[in-house]
Curated annotation (Swiss-Prot):
Gene: UL32
Primary location recorded for the protein, binned into one broad class: virion
Processing and modification events after translation: Phosphorylated by host CCNA2.
A GO cellular component entry from the record: host cell perinuclear region of cytoplasm
Compartments in which it is found: Virion tegument; Host cytoplasm; Host nucleus
Record keywords: Glycoprotein, Host cytoplasm, Host nucleus, Host-virus interaction, Phosphoprotein, Virion, Virion tegument
InterPro entries documented for this protein: Herpes_UL11/UL32 (IPR010340)
Compositional bias (Polar residues): 474-489, 730-742, 765-775, 790-799, 807-834, 977-986, 1007-1017
Originating organism: Human cytomegalovirus (strain AD169) (HHV-5)
Region described as Disordered: 366-386, 398-548, 658-944, 973-1032
Entry annotated with the keyword Glycoprotein: yes
Name of the protein this chain belongs to: Large structural phosphoprotein
Glycosylation sites: 921, 952
Family: Belongs to the herpesviridae large structural phosphoprotein family.
GO molecular function ontology, one term from the record: structural molecule activity
Length: 1048
């Protein structure tokens, strides 16, 4: 429940709210001890009635905050009882001179008990302290107070003055802030005093602490109730003379009696609940007629305006209300203040009665002339303020009227992106506009299918560069404002400045110079029709918005809102390679050889294994490493979403999935969308290792780590570093040659039935890890649920020069030259062997971060076949089981297969394809395996390892989407060839010549048909029978043209 204030500036409201929020941290929690906070209620510039309301609201919130932090003294009271027993025990054994008097005070200490009523705590403590002090003074032969009606003062016995002063300062701090008790660093066990005196001093300190807290709390509570009741009475008197409905309504609310905390909370709830009903009864300013809500003045406001506004109030009040008699004889009989003398604000800021000020000023020569001049100047200023407010109100009404008219206009006809459209007048496809290019270089874009000078719609406003001419304080004067149909359904709009796209720094959106953006958006309104998100000019809208974006967003995100996307535009260039992430090595396959050209993922039986830093993999149980997966149910079948598929194909720039598919996993799966950095040139190449000993050690370590649970180590804080931290195998600083970092590349050898030797490769550059998840709770062992176990790997990136911090959410890249094969040598063994034992399990995973770098072995139920992977969702038909399409064997493990790539023109990356996931089993459901950390409390993010060839141009990347079913984005006719189990890729591509045209999402098959009995040859493109990368590019272009023709 938030507080409501009237007529205050935003900084004043923030100051009031922050004061209440941090009340317990103030040295003094008394509100009246902070006069600056009370002045922020508008004491100097608001109407008296409004100031009283703001103060009432502040006191109600202050009282509620005090009771929320009501100090609990239960533990201190128990300590006090224990100390009372200790003093009585020592008192019974002490030889007092007057045993009868001492016996009475000892009986008081024995009977000291606290009842359920906290209001009696201070009285009980005070009686016990008086008796204890008398016993201590009797033991040291000090004089007692014997006067009638006086009691012995509660004081410390036989302590130094400096120690007593420190104790008094500590107790005074407790009295001013009873919520924060600072401990006293003082030793009260003095050797010069007896045990009875030391026990009494400790009892006195504890008792005075309880008394200060209780009495200061009761004092603040009484003060709050008194101030609230006082301001309620004043507001009732102020509103009594107002005959409007809202004033009477507020006055009836204020008549509720406030006697305790519950009644105060009830009054606060009533005031906040009906705030909009009575808010107009409180003027916004002392002398302003046109405020934010234009409150109407009542007849009793004239006197208040004259009194609070000073001389300036006479100019703002109409002529008939200006008093005609001098101030000396001014009568206040009818004033609602009942005899209160008016005050006037002087130049120096002090307040003086109006009669005295008038007598002092009338003695000066020429006073009336100066007063008249001053009033005239003030009148002119006030008139300007009123006129300015009227103009602003009129302009606002005009804008609202124009917006309503534009909403009633029919939407412009949707246009498809045309690759032949041009931005500048220098192209040769439209010769009739060459004469205009000399006059204006910024030629308006013509609609497709039209020609001539009249093809541009909207005149000067429809030009894509018209926003540059009308930016600033100007606004378009002619031409319709092309508002998308999706935006016209909203009731509230706001005018924003022209949006400049990222394709061209000086280009403004073609549909309108001033864009109309809705203030409120609901998820149900985002995708309610097939024609909702069509751009009026074919360009992707340029805003970081789920509805308006020209980016590729991860459509498998199970969260409600997508992650911040990366703006992308694409064209064909050099190939890139990404290995599958989130999978473990199968039983019949070890680590494979990394090749400089990407391996065709569709020629392999199933997904590629995940490269880990030490080569440790968890095998799959049984003789069938490729476990089949059942087909998708009806609600998850992409063939049952024809409407959404058609919409996604028609609007490729809106790659956002609002249709959350039902999943059984409890942990959300997200893909880290990333932006590559320019990789440094590597100094060494990947070296293949054929060491049988290293493989044997890895398999031995696997057998031991599979049986041992994963524990949080003491290096949790060191491991869970930020996105720029560098992690090595032994958690040490990387050396200059970086020969100790070992990576295990993936392999695709399904024909082997026995565990093969794991081949290791070395990288010549350090690896950095990217972590975007939360840090798990330290000191706790977290059990990973069976259904949410997902494998993850560490994203690796070469460090160029200094170890720069990588942007969170961006993938890291590895130069492709690191993956060039070298002649295998028995001497090139791993310089850091993995030792056996459960304690060294973290070394095999290269000291991964706790949350995002954990490697969890999925169980059999979590296996995702290629038919259910997000890339296979491109097919419109229902995915077939994994058994129906047996994979073609790979003959050469070191073969090179070319894959077409996409070059980003705006710093983004293209989604080319992803090897499907590999089923992994071998551990019990819900049990951790491998050398991972249990961090299932945070969402897991499958890592992405992108390998780039050595080039100075911008690189594209291959993104691995998590195995979550998503709706198809192709029409049935366009994806008939993609219904098999072959891996497909999705790319948002533009024209090879111009990257500023509209982008389309196309699907192409990475597994091209090859001759029977022959596998992919090294160096071949492996796409559509192409032998060179250029042929592969031509094949993809032909498929894009076929899809366009199919749509038309």
């Amino acid at each position: 429940m938030s507080l409501q204030f009237i007529g205050l500036q935003r900084r004043d409201v923030v100051a009031l709210v922050n004061f209440l929020r941090h009340l317990t941290q103030k040295p003094d929690v008394d509100l009246e001890a902070h006069p600056k906070i009370l002045k922020k209620c508008g004491e100097k510039r608001l109407h008296r009635r409004t100031v009283l309301f703001n103060e009432l609201m502040l006191w109600l919130g202050y009282y509620r905050e005090l009771r929320f932090h009501n100090p609990d003294l239960s533990s201190v009271l128990e300590e006090f009882e224990v100390r009372c027993v200790a003093v009585a025990r020592r008192g019974y054994t002490y030889p007092f001179g007057d045993r009868g008097k001492a016996r009475d005070h000892l009986a008081v200490l024995d009977r000291t008990e606290f009842d359920t009523d906290v209001r009696h705590d201070a009285e009980i403590v005070e009686r016990a302290l008086v008796s204890a002090v008398i016993l201590a003074k009797m033991s040291v032969r000090e004089t007692l107070v014997t006067a009638i009606g006086q009691t012995e003062p509660i004081a410390f016995v036989h302590l130094k003055d400096t120690e007593v002063q420190r104790i008094e300062e500590n107790l005074e701090g407790v009295r001013r802030n009873m919520f924060c008790v600072k401990p006293l660093d003082l030793n009260l066990d003095r050797h010069a005093n007896t045990a009875l005196v030391n026990a009494v001093n400790k009892l006195v300190y504890t008792g005075r602490l309880i008394m200060n807290v209780r009495r200061s709390w009761e004092e603040l509570e009484r003060k709050c109730l008194a101030r609230i009741q006082e301001r309620c009475k004043l507001l009732v008197k102020e509103l009594r003379m107002c005959l409007s409905f809202d004033s009477n309504y507020c006055r009836n609310i204020l008549k509720h009696a406030v006697e305790n905390g519950d009644s105060a909370d009830t009054l606060l709830e009533l005031l906040i609940e009906d705030f909009d009903i009575y808010v107009d009864s409180f003027p916004q300013s002392a002398h302003t007629f046109l405020g934010a809500r234009s409150p109407s003045l009542e007849f009793d406001d004239d006197a208040n305006l004259l009194s609070l506004g000073g001389g300036s109030a006479f100019s703002s009040v109409p002529k008939k209300h200006v008093p005609t008699q001098p101030l000396d004889g001014w009568s206040w009989i009818a004033s609602p203040w009942k005899g209160h003398k008016p005050f006037r604000f002087e130049a120096h800021g002090s307040l003086a009665p109006a009669a005295e000020a008038h007598a002092a000023r009338s003695a000066a020569v020429g006073y009336y002339d100066e007063e008249e001049k001053r009033r005239e100047r003030q009148k002119r200023v006030d008139d300007e303020v009123v006129q300015r407010e009227k103009q602003q109100l009129k302009a606002w009404e005009e804008r609202q009227q124009n917006l309503q008219q534009r909403q009633q206009q029919p939407p412009p006809p949707a246009r498809k992106p045309s690759a032949s459209r041009r931005l500048f007048g220098s192209s040769a496809d439209e010769d009739d506009d060459d004469d205009d290019d000399e006059k204006n270089i910024f030629t308006p874009i013509k609609k497709p299918g039209t020609s001539g000078k009249g093809a541009a719609s909207g005149g000067g406003v429809s030009s894509i560069f018209s926003g540059l001419l009308s930016s600033g304080s100007q606004k378009p004067t002619s031409g319709p404002l092309n508002i998308p149909q999706q935006q016209q359904r909203h009731a509230a709009f706001s005018l924003v400045s022209p949006q400049v796209t990222k394709a061209s720094p000086g280009r403004v959106r073609r549909d309108s110079a001033w864009d109309v953006r809705p203030l409120t958006e609901t998820r149900g309104d985002l995708f309610s029709g097939d024609e909702d998100s069509d751009s009026s000019d074919g360009y992707p809208p340029n805003r970081q918005d789920p509805r308006f974006t020209d980016t590729l967003v991860d459509i498998t995100d199970t969260e409600t809102s997508a992650k911040p996307p990366v703006t992308t535009a694409y064209k064909f260039e050099q190939p890139t390679l990404t290995f599958g992430a989130g999978v473990n090595v199968p039983a019949g396959a070890g680590a494979a050889i990394l090749t400089p050209t990407p391996v065709n993922p569709s020629t392999a039986p199933a997904p590629a294994p995940t490269p880990t830093f030490a080569g440790t993999q968890t095998p799959v149980n049984g003789n069938s490493p490729w476990a089949p997966t059942a087909p998708l149910p009806g609600d998850m079948n992409p063939a049952n979403w024809p409407r959404e598929r058609a919409w996604a194909l028609k609007n490729p720039h809106l790659a956002y999935n609002p249709f959350r598919m039902p999943t059984t996993s409890t942990a959300s799966q997200n893909t880290v969308s990333t932006t590559p950095r320019r990789p440094s040139t590597p100094r060494a190449a990947v070296t293949q290792t054929a060491s049988r000993d290293a493989a044997d050690e890895v398999w031995a370590l696997r057998d031991q780590t599979a049986e041992s649970p994963v524990e949080d180590s003491e290096e949790e804080d060191d491991d869970s570093s930020d996105t720029g931290s560098v992690v090595s195998l032994g958690h040490t600083t990387p050396s200059s040659d970086y020969n100790n970092d070992v990576i295990s590349p993936p392999s695709q050898t399904p024909e082997q039935s026995t565990p093969s030797r794991i081949r290791k490769a070395k990288l010549s550059s350090p690896m950095t890890t990217t972590s975007t998840s939360q840090k798990p709770v330290l000191g706790k062992r977290v059990a990973t649920p069976h259904a949410s176990a997902r494998a993850q790997t560490v994203t690796s990136t070469p460090v160029q020069g200094r170890l720069e911090k990588q942007v969170s959410g961006t993938p890291s890249t590895v130069p492709a030259t690191l993956l060039q094969p070298q002649p295998a040598s028995s001497k090139t063994t791993s310089s850091r062997n993995v030792t056996s034992g459960a304690g060294t399990s973290s070394a095999s995973s290269a000291r991964q971060p706790s949350a995002s770098a954990s490697v969890l072995s999925p169980t059999e139920d979590d296996v995702v076949s290629p038919a259910t992977s997000p890339l296979s969702m491109l097919s419109s038909a229902s995915p077939s089981p994994a058994k129906s399409a047996p994979p073609s064997p790979v003959k050469g493990r070191g073969s090179r297969v070319g894959v077409p790539s996409l070059k980003p023109t705006l710093g983004g990356k293209a989604v080319v394809g992803r090897p499907p996931s590999v089923p992994v089993s071998g551990s019990a459901p819900g049990r951790l395996s491998g050398s991972s950390r249990a961090a299932s409390t945070t969402p897991t993010y499958p890592a992405v390892t992108t390998v780039y060839p050595p080039s100075s141009t911008a690189k594209s990347s291959v993104s691995n989407a998590p195995p979550v079913a998503s709706p198809s984005i192709l029409k049935p006719g366009a994806s008939a060839a993609l219904q098999s189990r072959r891996s497909t890729g999705t790319a948002a591509v533009g024209s090879p010549v111009k990257s500023t045209t509209g982008m389309k999402t196309v699907a192409f098959d990475l597994s091209s048909p090859q001759k029977s009995g022959t596998g992919p040859q090294p160096g071949s493109a492996g796409m559509g029978g192409a032998k060179t990368p250029s042929d592969a590019v031509q094949n993809i272009l032909q498929k894009i043209e076929k899809i366009k023709n199919t749509e038309e």
